[in-house]
Amino acid sequence: SDCLERRAQKSFPNALTVHRLDMDTSGLMVMGLNKFAHRHLSLQFQNRNVGKTYFAWVYGNLKKEEGMIDLPIICDWDNRPKQMVHFKNGKPSQTKWHVIKKNKNKTLVRLIPITGRTHQLRVHMNELGHPILGDRFYAHDQALNMSYRLCLHATEITVMQPIKKTKITFKAPVPF
C-alpha cells in the first residue's frame, strides 16, 4: 500500500517514521534517515522534548483568548477509532490553545499539545464546545459542513538535531 514511509525510502532507503499524524491532519511529520537518528528522535517524542504547534479552524468564537485544556482521554472502544474524555480511566492529556483570529462563526486557534494522545486536539476542542471544522469523527453537522476537509494542520515542529545537539525548527504553511 502507498504510505509516506515507503515513498521516503525510495530516496532514503533507511528512513523510518518517528511519529504519526491522524490520517486527515495535514502538515509536518518527522522521519529519521537512519536507525541512529530514528532512535534519538523517537526518544525526544517519548520524553516530550519536542515542540509541536498546530493551527485549526474551530466552530464558533471562544470566550477567552487563551487557555489550557486538561482532560484525560481514553479509547472509546465501542466507537473505535474515536477517543473520549474519561475521568476515571483516561490518560492525562493537556493542550494549550491561543486565539489567532475570529470570524463570524469560526475561530483560528494555535494548539500546542503537551501530551500526544490519539485525537487529543480534536477531542479537547470538541469538549470545549468548539469542534474542529470538517472533523468527521467529532464535529456536529454544522461544523462538519463548514469545511470539506479537517481544518487541523501541524505547522511547526522543533527537535534536537541528534548529532549536532542543536535545536532545529521545521515549518509548513497552513493550507486553509
Task: Identify the residue ranges that each predicted region occupies.
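Pseudouridine synthases involved in rRNA/tRNA modification
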Residues: 120-176
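Short beta-strand segments
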Residues: 67, 71, 93-95, 107, ...
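RNA pseudouridine synthases
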Residues: 1-94, 101-104, 151, 175-176
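Short, low-complexity Ser/Thr-rich regulatory SLiMs
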Residues: 99-101, 161
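Short histidine-centered loop motifs in beta-beta connectors
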Residues: 109-112
